[in-house]
């Protein structure tokens, strides 16, 4: 990790130092996804079977997972892991139930009633990556709010063979239909529908560059599907003072660095001693990690910033706008009112990012790449939509009519004005 003294940097150097590793949909990825999209749209299930054999090296008999497969997966899963998943589910449910909106109903003036109604998105699709580290925790983060929101149809896609923990978590959370389909083809199938895979209105979940590009494409297609967010490489910024435990700080940096070679981790501290001790702790802990090679690649483009004080630390963090922000300082909550840009915040020495990733209750699907300046972590609201209602009594209409007529005339929208004038003339 490169260590930089913040006050010694020029404005241009500061901007450069906070730049994330470049991401782009390379031409070959875009072309490959184009071909997959055209194939799945044209050939439906046939294309999905062929692509599973090509990419996943699995010859499927059925795209849909059977109830028997789900039951057998639950039987194979260790009881300890089942209990852990159930406990995490309880906390995630509690946090997302607290987000159920209170519907607004207000009389803006006498005889003029305005409301906000919330309705679930009817059909949602959840994408869960497979591979060597299947993200069954993401099933909880997506399926639980979908269920609480009241989505009428919840389907899930994951590459075959689907891990037992994913099947167990999906069934536990009430996912009705699970398809053993992965990659860009799964996103396309959910967006447009096939003979077997149900078309959905919105797609949620992370994935590799091909999945990300497929989500981008279907979200821009006229008859495609909306998406939760465009995901970039994962990232964490740790803000720590001289009282922080360097072993704790190092473990938080590494827990993010092990996600991928394109991940980025940042330490911001006013303490040069802590910075040095954290670097040493990182080196020690790296030797114990099975994914140390991946973590080392991420550390190569990561940074340590030495700030003048905690206020400057917060300013640097707000400028970077991290996906995850770990605050390991004395009286960490005192800084909360000054933090403007972060996806999820972890306050205090005993709130590592891992807790939010799995079981504290908050959602781990977060904006990356600086989008926390304008975007929020995934929540219940993402699985629903708002409708506004207005209802005017004859007297309420009459009292407001002049205001609307004047405004419509000023904008030269005569039909708007006339819609009021005609009614006004008929009120006795």
UniProtKB/Swiss-Prot annotation:
Its domain of life reads Bacteria
Q: Which GO terms describe its molecular function?
A: histidinol dehydrogenase activity; NAD binding; zinc ion binding
The active site lies at 323-324
Q: Does the keyword NAD apply?
A: yes
What EC identifiers does the entry list? 1.1.1.23
Does the record bear Transmembrane in its keywords? no
Phylogenetic placement of the source organism: Bacteria, Pseudomonadati, Pseudomonadota, Gammaproteobacteria, Pasteurellales
Binding of Zn(2+) occurs at 256, 259, 357, 416
Q: What Gene3D superfamilies does this protein's entry cite?
A: 1.20.5.1300, Nitrogenase molybdenum iron protein domain
Co-factor(s): Zn(2+)
Annotated family: Belongs to the histidinol dehydrogenase family.
- Official protein name in the record: Histidinol dehydrogenase
């Amino acid at each position: 990790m490169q260590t930089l003294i913040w006050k010694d940097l020029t404005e241009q150097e500061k901007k450069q130092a906070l730049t994330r590793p470049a991401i782009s949909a390379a031409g070959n990825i875009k072309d490959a996804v184009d071909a997959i999209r055209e194939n799945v749209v044209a050939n439906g299930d046939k294309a999905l079977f062929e692509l599973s054999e090509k990419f996943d090296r699995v010859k499927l008999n059925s795209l849909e997972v059977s109830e028997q497969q789900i039951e057998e997966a639950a039987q194979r899963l260790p009881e300890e892991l089942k209990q852990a998943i159930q406990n995490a589910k309880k906390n995630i449910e509690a946090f997302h139930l607290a987000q159920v909106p209170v519907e607004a109903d207000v009389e803006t003036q006498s005889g003029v009633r305005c409301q906000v109604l919330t309705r679930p998105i009817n059909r949602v699709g959840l994408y869960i990556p497979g591979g060597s580290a299947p993200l069954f925790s993401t099933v909880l983060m997506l399926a639980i709010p979908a269920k609480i929101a009241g989505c009428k149809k919840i389907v899930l896609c994951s590459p075959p063979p689907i891990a037992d923990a994913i099947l167990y978590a999906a069934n536990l959370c009430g996912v009705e239909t699970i398809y053993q389909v992965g990659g860009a083809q799964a996103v396309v199938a959910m967006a447009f529908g096939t003979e077997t895979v149900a078309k959905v209105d919105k797609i949620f979940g992370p994935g590799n560059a091909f999945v990300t590009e497929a989500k981008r494409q279907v979200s821009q297609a006229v008859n495609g599907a909306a998406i939760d967010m465009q995901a970039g490489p994962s990232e964490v910024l740790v803000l720590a003072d001289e009282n922080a435990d360097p072993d704790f700080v190092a473990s938080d940096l590494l827990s993010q660095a092990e996600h991928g070679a394109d991940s980025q981790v940042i330490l911001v501290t006013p303490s040069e001693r802590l910075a040095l001790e954290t670097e040493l702790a990182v080196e020690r802990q790296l030797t114990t990690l099975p994914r140390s090679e991946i973590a080392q690649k991420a550390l190569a483009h990561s940074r340590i910033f030495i700030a003048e004080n905690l206020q400057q630390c917060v300013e640097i963090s707000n400028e970077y706008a991290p996906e995850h922000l770990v605050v390991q300082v004395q009286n960490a909550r005192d800084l909360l009112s000054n933090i403007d840009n972060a996806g999820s915040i972890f306050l205090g020495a005993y709130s590592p990012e891992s807790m939010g990733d799995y079981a504290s209750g908050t959602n781990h699907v977060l904006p990356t790449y600086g989008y926390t300046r304008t975007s929020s972590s995934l929540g219940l609201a993402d699985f629903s939509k708002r409708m506004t209602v207005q209802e005017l009594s004859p007297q309420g209409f009459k009292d407001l009519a002049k205001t609307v007529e004047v405004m419509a005339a000023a904008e030269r929208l005569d039909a708007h004005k006339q819609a009021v004038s005609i009614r006004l003339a008929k009120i006795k």
